[in-house]
């Protein structure tokens, strides 16, 4: 997405992890939601992490756009980790994943009603890979990011994350942070207080 800040080397890293033929067909980088988690900042303050440099507290502000894979409440920050859901704002997806997804969900084909271009003239179906839904099992709202990941996993495609990356998310503030810093504080990287990093 255009509001994600990243190091260009991170793109090459995702490409290397998700290279054709790899079992890692979907790989994302972690970026923070557009909010400040004041309780995490307070933990860092209480531990003295901002005493010498108060700007270092910016590493502790975020809830990240991912959820760990089912049954996993710890993620190592120095290796690729399987996740249940990750943000599509910084994600690399192999063509094979799109093809597998399309075969699994033929009901997501539709005829577009925007027909003012050569390739969208209303005569061919296109695929809705990203949509917002209410999960029928949990009644949880799934954003287009999370819906895509959940349906991909249901189609047998695992979703992976490179947790060492440091991305930003631009809003009214440049939301940043560091999963490594959050691990040092022993706080959750998401809004779930039971999930931990190590």
Q: What is each residue range found by the language model?
A:
Residues 1-4:
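Short acidic donor-binding/metal-coordinating loop in glycosyltransferase active sites
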Residues 103-198:
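C-terminal catalytic/acceptor-binding lobe
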């Amino acid at each position: 997405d255009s509001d994600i800040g990243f190091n260009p080397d991170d793109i090459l890293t995702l490409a290397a992890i998700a290279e054709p033929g790899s079992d890692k067909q979907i790989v994302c980088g972690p970026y923070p939601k557009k909010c400040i988690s004041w309780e995490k900042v307070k933990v860092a303050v209480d531990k003295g992490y901002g005493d010498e440099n108060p700007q270092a507290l910016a590493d502790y502000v975020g809830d990240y756009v991912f959820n760990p894979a089912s049954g996993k409440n710890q993620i190592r920050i120095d290796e690729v980790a399987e996740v249940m859901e990750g943000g599509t704002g910084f994600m690399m997806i192999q063509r094979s994943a799109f093809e597998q997804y399309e075969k699994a969900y033929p009901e997501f084909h539709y005829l577009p009603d925007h027909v003012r271009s050569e390739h969208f003239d209303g005569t061919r179906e296109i695929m809705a890979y990203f949509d917002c839904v209410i999960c029928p099992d949990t009644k949880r709202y799934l954003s287009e990011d999370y819906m895509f990941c959940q349906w991909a996993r249901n189609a047998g495609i695992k979703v992976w994350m490179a947790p060492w990356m440091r991305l930003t998310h631009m809003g009214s503030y440049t939301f940043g942070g560091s999963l490594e810093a959050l691990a040092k504080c022993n706080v959750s990287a998401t809004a779930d207080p039971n999930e931990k990093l190590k």
